[in-house]
Amino acid sequence: VFVDPIHESMDALSVAYSLLKSHEVIDLLIIMLGTNDVKERFNANAACIGAGMERLILKAKSVDCWGTRAPNILVVAPPRIGDGFHDAVMGEGCVEKSKGVAEQFRIVAERQNVHFLNAADCEFNQVDFMHLTRKGHAQLADLLAKKVPTLL
């Protein structure tokens, strides 16, 4: 959600309207964000990152892209950053902050009456300790294959 002064166009909020309108009618919006928001330069804790997700959900709900149906949104919490990760760009504390993101997203999803899926157990790589491996992508695909049909 946060505007990154180093990496252009990394904030979902500023592009949400155009993306949703260009793909209407939306049957199901799946949002899997949050890892970049733990960067030290944003000075945001897990609760603040959850508030950012809530703001994005509210934005998505407000866009006239749902046809005659109510907004149907699935929030997917990404795996937490691995303990072996140390990177100057992400900054100190990103590993610890990432541990609380899934719970905050669950709370926000419940409050906003949207769906929630925790991808915490999907395997991430040992290079940047954030992005999914081939196996992790397969695990996420399995989770989504079970969840998505129940939402449509």
Please tell me what each predicted stretch does.
Residues 1-11:
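Acidic/histidine-rich helix-loop elements
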Residues 9-152:
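Alpha-helical cap/lid subdomain in secreted, periplasmic
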